[in-house]
């Protein structure tokens, strides 16, 4: 079975889409375009994709040319719409493709990367493919894809969060230091108790002489020795 036949069967749910020429007139073209989301290929148009801000979503397109003449894929764009009121929320940046020529009865693939950065809400993504045929550029809309977009959860070990924590910690420590230097020192000086000077035990126990002191030949003061004791010593020396 030819590869183009497989892709045609895969896109059988997509009817022949309406192409819009740059002249503003409307016509029907026999070009089938479908895509899958490479990160979640199991999702269909009836499912809701879940994306986080900061994600990069890759759409892989399959273009089947059922026209009688050759077509050329030259670009891709798209829109995020409000699925409730169908209002356009934002347009995707137009990306250049190829150009890639697609002969009659053949099919080609190409990718489009989309950076998700929207207010958390529900959206419908509708891509558009630019096709050149017979000197005209035709814009062919693809099927819509419902998606729920949320903000990415911030990890405690995220380098940006760690840096912010360090900045806050250093700032807080700096404020405490400045506050202590300006007010803290003066406050603690005013409330701190005054320490009494300690007197050594040796100085406290030593007697203070009230009169003149005499020193004996032995080298010590004899004023405090009882007189009877001194007489006994002299008597012993005479004997």
Curated annotation (Swiss-Prot):
Compartment(s) where it occurs, according to its Swiss-Prot or TrEMBL record: Endoplasmic reticulum membrane
InterPro entries xref list: TRAP_alpha
Residue ranges, Lumenal side: 20-161
Top-level taxonomic group: Eukaryota
Comp. bias (Low complexity): 201-213
Renumbered residue ranges of the record's region Disordered: 201-222
One family name in Pfam for this protein: TRAP_alpha
Listed GO CC annotations: endoplasmic reticulum; endoplasmic reticulum membrane
Residues in the signal sequence: 1-19
Transmembrane segments: 162-182
Membrane topology: Single-pass type I membrane protein
UniProt topological domain (Cytoplasmic) ranges: 183-239
Keywords of this entry: Endoplasmic reticulum, Membrane, Signal, Transmembrane, Transmembrane helix
Keyword Nucleotide-binding found: no
Function of the protein: Is probably involved in a pathway contributing to genomic integrity.
Membership in a protein family: Belongs to the IRC22 family.
Name of the protein this chain belongs to: Increased recombination centers protein 22-1
Organism in which the protein naturally occurs: Candida albicans (strain SC5314 / ATCC MYA-2876) (Yeast)
